[in-house]
């Protein structure tokens, strides 16, 4: 099998770049379908529409309904056809951006991805995560190429909720853990190929950056400051993690995230990254990570306020039957658990999740605030 490396055609990051982006946008198209949720539109979208129109770009704004489902993608695709869009812009969080990619693919036009949060590694990838209308994981949708443009305005990121940045750090923390598992098993990446050395190296650098600058960046956002530490973490969350997971591969951490979508209740109020955080700890447990490495991740998660127990996941009374549903969905043949370097059964997932919950409670009782 060949090795493949993928990345967006152009990546732009910095303070105030959103309103200095006309030259990048007009290279791609002048009839823009802008997909954005209500919050993103209020924060930046309305002003951005005016900015584009001032630069001779015709814009059709379509409100995003909040779920990257087939029905939502088809709905907006029809609007794009009627408008005659030659460029789709996704503005907002991960699900809006994933939907924008799918809509552009349906329309066979270019796509520009403009995240208003550094909360996931979705922006740079050539795939979308699809869910049912009710929010249960459905499938991955793959494309022939990565986005034509990813543009990240760190001034906007600095004014977003701190929780969104920590969620992005959590998502990015899985990148190297999963990439190294794929490497050990000589598995396949999300590009359907073997890892390149570059993809693996980026995943490793991503983890190094997160541990080095993560807490500084969180403090910066808490004070709405676009610091150098924040710039580094935004790049790690968005570019390094996005390229690293795609060219490095996914394994148990994201499969367990997908498994958790089988549960009902307030767990659905958690972000993608918050669920991935628990998935990463579970993968480390499955691998038999030594105590020093496991504790490094656990301590960092606790510092950032990320979920490390069932109570944190809003499932304090979860039953073995419900955990088995998580295990079964996460080990489905179409998910990334198959890239682990050893066979993982649903029962193994249940045992590992219970082990993480128990160890975190023990660790906190004996180490936190002692």
Language model regions located:
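Short glycine/serine/threonine-rich phosphate/pyrophosphate-binding segments
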Residues: 18, 41-45, 95-102, 120-124, ...
């Amino acid at each position: 099998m060949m090795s493949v490396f993928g990345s967006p055609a152009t990546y732009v990051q910095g303070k105030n770049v959103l309103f200095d982006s006309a030259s990048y946008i007009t290279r791609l198209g002048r009839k823009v379908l802008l997909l954005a949720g209500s919050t993103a539109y209020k924060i930046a979208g309305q002003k951005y529409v005016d900015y584009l129109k001032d630069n001779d770009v015709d814009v059709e704004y379509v409100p995003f309904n909040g779920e990257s489902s087939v029905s939502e993608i088809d709905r907006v695709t029809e609007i794009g056809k009627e408008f005659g869009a030659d460029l789709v812009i996704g503005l907002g969080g991960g699900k809006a951006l994933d939907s924008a990619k799918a809509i552009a693919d349906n329309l066979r036009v270019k796509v520009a991805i403009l995240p208003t949060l550094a909360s996931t590694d979705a922006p740079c990838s050539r795939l979308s995560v699809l869910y049912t209308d009710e929010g249960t994981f459905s499938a991955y949708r793959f494309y022939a190429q990565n986005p034509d443009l990813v543009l990240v305005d760190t001034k906007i990121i600095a004014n977003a909720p701190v929780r969104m940045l920590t969620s992005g750090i959590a998502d990015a923390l899985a990148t190297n853990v999963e990439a190294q598992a794929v490497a050990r098993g000589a598995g396949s990446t999300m590009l359907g190929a073997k890892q390149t050395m570059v993809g693996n190296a980026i995943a490793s650098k991503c983890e190094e950056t997160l541990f080095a600058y993560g807490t500084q960046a969180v403090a910066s956002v808490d004070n709405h400051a676009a610091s150098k530490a924040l710039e580094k973490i935004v790049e790690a969350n968005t570019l390094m993690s996005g390229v690293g997971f795609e060219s490095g591969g996914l394994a148990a951490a994201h499969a367990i995230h997908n498994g958790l979508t089988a549960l009902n209740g307030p767990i659905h109020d958690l972000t993608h990254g918050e669920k991935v955080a628990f998935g990463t700890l579970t993968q480390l447990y499955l691998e038999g990570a030594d105590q020093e490495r496991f504790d490094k991740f656990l301590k960092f998660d606790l510092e950032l306020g990320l979920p490390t127990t069932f109570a944190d996941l809003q499932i304090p009374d979860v039953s073995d039957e419900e955990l088995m549903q998580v295990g079964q969905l996460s080990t489905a043949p179409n998910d990334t658990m198959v890239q682990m370097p050893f066979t993982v059964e649903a029962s193994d997932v249940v045992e590992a999740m219970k082990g993480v919950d128990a160890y975190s409670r023990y660790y906190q009782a004996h180490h936190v605030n002692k």
